[in-house]
Amino acid sequence: MPGTLSRRTFLANAAAVPAATLIPTGVATPARPSVTTASLIDAERGVIRSAMDGSGIGAAAVCLVEGGQVRWTEGFGHVSGQGSVPVDASTMFSIQSTSKNFAAVAVLLAVQDGILDLDAPITRYLPSFTVRSRFEHAPQERISLRLLLANRAGFTHEAPLGNNYELASPGFDAHVRSISQTWLRFPVGTRYRYSNLGFDLAGHVLEQVAGISYPAWLQRRIFEPLGMHDSTADASVYLASKVRALGTQEGHTQVPPVTPLVVSGGVWTSAADMAKYLGFLLGGGRSGAQQLLEPRLWDEMHGFGLGGDYGLGVMRSERLYGSTPVRLLHHRGGGFGFGCVFTYCRQANAGFAAMFNRATSAGYGIGERLLDQLLSARFGPRQPRVPLSSLAPIRLTQDQMQQMAGSWIGRSGKAKIGVAGNGELQLHRGAHAEGTRFAAIDGDQLFTVDTDGEVATYRYHAATDMLPAYLECSNGEDGLDQNDPIDGPTGPQAPHWQPWLGRYRVDQWGRPSMFVVLEQRHGWLYIDGIRLVAEVEPGLLFTSDGEAVDFRGSQPTWRNLRLRRVAPMGQG
């Protein structure tokens, strides 16, 4: 990449590379793997056993598809502890949010049938649906299936009924109805924010139009055609299985076996079936001689037309191996006692999945080394995509640095931007994280470089009268909302806030999950350190990252989660 990147091409060049030619493939009869692949598989077995030791993972299963063939399926551990049935390639696991990939395919099949339109307002199919917004009138009229599947409709992550915290599942219909009680975090279509609700709503639209349940649609249009006999989203089916893995979570003797998040997190499947699904995706929607999903719709799903790194139910990571730009397509899952990693790469004609019965960092590392070495063997060693010599950082003015300095909040946690001794900005993620150079090539475009030499780009969006400043990141999950600017104005310090101050508990499945403090600083309210920047009516407030905090009723909520008071301010 010779020369210096211009201001307007920087984000595009750093965040995306051309996809290689797409080579159709399918899953064929397993064949003897090459020595190289066999040795990598053998090494990965050691990685898996190491990940399971000491992490609480008692059951895991994996699959590897390469060159149109199933190279590896294997189970590890036992479905519910020592002495129970050993895990094998047919053991069923919950894949949680990896289900969103299936949801996108399910909706696109209905688009292929002509019964759904990706870009029509969802009110065409759900005329009575409404959702609350402080930014615009009738936001539902602007929400499309495309925005739902791309996490760009503005929804929060949890619903009042049926979420990752409540003990009893109210059922999918009640869960979807409760979405109308939620408040959008941002104006429709303006930002990426990961959300279960958008996918569940999209699946509900599909049910209404198709006239059958979402699990039945998956069975008829995906699982049966692909021969995925161990797969279902029907709770009555997976609960009846005597060889399904049992989810586990630290602090809980039991994890609820049924999730109300049927679309966004409800698929159960096996390693053998995931290999078949990987073959379908690597084949561009083809399975054997059958084109199940038209190529144009496969491209729609993986086209990333709205920008960022999230397409329709799939994420991308761009890498460079040797001189070859490589796109990894993936979607993780985690919750209700399970975790899943799921990655496919069409340039290498390879895909990998791992499922495990505890969502731990050790589990999410399974397969990383294997895929990296496969790609290195195919294309050459991994290289940084954007040479630092191509970047020409500038020194920001004092005013520009001042507007970015302060605390920020994002889905991946809290962050702080400060000025280092050399006069450059530093980005700190996490309470004790070392700073990373936060350099600019223009007043509103900045970048960081990670330990692998990869560039992450940010675009600064100034504050408006309704929202704080925002840093849009090429890695969508790392976007940041400004929480506390340096030398920001003093808040209104409303007297009616005083009775609410104190310490609160959020329960998950009937047990304490986290404790948060509602406090007042510099005239502003803060919950868990996040500033409440707007009060649209007495008792209804919104945080700097767009979440609703509601003290109007007898049961206060934050992010639609119930707050149980532990002690007033100054006590407990």
PLM regions and their residue ranges:
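Short, conserved catalytic-motif segment at the N-terminal edge
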Residues: 35-95, 115-117, 130-134, 177-183
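Short, small/polar residue-rich loop motifs at catalytic or cofactor-binding pockets
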Residues: 56-59, 336-338, 413
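Short, surface-exposed loop or secondary-structure junction motifs
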Residues: 69-71, 76-80, 133-342
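Short, glycine/proline-biased beta-turn/loop segments that scaffold the active-site neighborhood
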Residues: 118-134, 225-226
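Short, well-ordered beta-strand elements
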Residues: 340-358, 468-472
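Peripheral terminal and inter-domain segments
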Residues: 372-572
